[in-house]
Amino acid sequence: MGKSSTKPKGATSYRDTAFGIIPRSKLINLEIEGTKRGLEYIENLLSRQKDKKISPDLILGLHKVSFSCILPKWAGKLRVIQVAFSGKEAPAFYQLSELVMNFCRDTEERISHLPNQDKENFVLDVVALLAWFQHKFVFIHPFQDYNGRTARMLTILILLRLGLPPIELRSETESDRRSYLNAMQKGDQGDLSLLEKLISQALTESLENIKNL
């Protein structure tokens, strides 16, 4: 099985989209629309089950709903090729089913050990959990593409489930992407502090916006 490399600086490959080769500007619009569909999917899930668990089926379903209009051949399916991203090789594709299952179980176990919301360290512990979650998900790289976007949408699901507001980790500008990728690369070295800082800043901003309503 051949190895595929994602583009440098986190750019998404779009050569095999359902629309053929399209300008980056058009792809961005499709990605934004896909993310909106994904967030609506999450809202619908939580409206039926407030404590919706992170599971392989949920992850695959979210990816399919969000990106099948762009890449219908493999949206919602675990990758079946070997890929490299950000200068490193992703785990072997034939290990993905087990890795994703263990990741979901680990996530739920960590959520179950969070302190009560009235505890002083609740938000700090949530931020640490989300930083671990995002980094681990992208490291596993379950999909051929859109792993980062899927991780960020799942982060919102966890926040809403915990009674916290959604956050937006900006990634559209070059500066935003550089900050996020630097934080993720630090995580590769076992240091999640930069990613925790980005998540903490975004969560603080969301909480402040609620107070100002």
Where are the predicted features?
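FIC/Doc superfamily catalytic core
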Residues: 1-145, 149-213
